[in-house]
Amino acid sequence: MSVDKKSELKIRAIENGTVIDHITANKSLHILKILGLPDSETKNVTVAMNVSSKEIGRKDIVKIENRELNHEELDQIALIAPKASVNIIRDYKPVKKDKIILPNTITGIIKCTNSKCITNYANEPIAPKFNVINNHPPVVRCHYCEKLIKTEDIEKQFE
């Protein structure tokens, strides 16, 4: 099977940093917002949106040069793109590749949508805490008021 060279899309390789692949199509801008990108310190950020994927049909890809993501950032990304994978790149080579995994408990990343939840009172310094009910698509339940928060409501918090 020959590949038509004119139809290939080339995205420059990064020397060091992170590649987030298999992001749900058209969700990469949410990922950039979660990560606070672009910023003045990050040299290059490359975004490919709605590209063809054999695995998931359509996907987004984000490449971040000279930055490796921490666990909290990966947990946030898991809420938006639960099937994404993360590649750590050093000297142009992938040294670590992991699927993003939604933890069983999420603390402080999103807010409870129940206005009467104790976590939403200014005079109660309690961080929102959620138990993950479903991974694909993400659904969580508030630890305090037991409000179920569906994927759409989670995504709205990152818009």
From Swiss-Prot:
BP terms from Gene Ontology: 'de novo' pyrimidine nucleobase biosynthetic process; pyrimidine nucleotide biosynthetic process
Protein keywords: Metal-binding, Pyrimidine biosynthesis, Zinc
Classification via InterPro entries: Asp_carbamoyltransf_reg_N, Asp_carbamoylTrfase_reg, Asp_carbamoyltrfase_reg_C, Asp_carbatrfase_reg_C_sf, Asp_carbatrfase_reg_N_sf
Disulfide pairings: none
Annotated GO MF terms: metal ion binding
GO cellular component terms, A-Z: aspartate carbamoyltransferase complex
Binding site for Zn(2+): 112, 117, 142, 145
Cofactor: Zn(2+)
Pfam families referenced in this protein's UniProt entry, alphabetically: PyrI, PyrI_C
Superkingdom of origin organism: Archaea
Record note on cofactor: Binds 1 zinc ion per subunit.
Subunit (UniProt): Contains catalytic and regulatory chains.
Family classification: Belongs to the PyrI family.
PANTHER family referenced in this protein's UniProt entry, alphabetically: ASPARTATE CARBAMOYLTRANSFERASE REGULATORY CHAIN
Function: Involved in allosteric regulation of aspartate carbamoyltransferase.
Protein name, as recorded: Aspartate carbamoyltransferase regulatory chain
Lineage per the UniProt record: Archaea, Methanobacteriati, Methanobacteriota, Methanomada group, Methanobacteria
Gene: pyrI
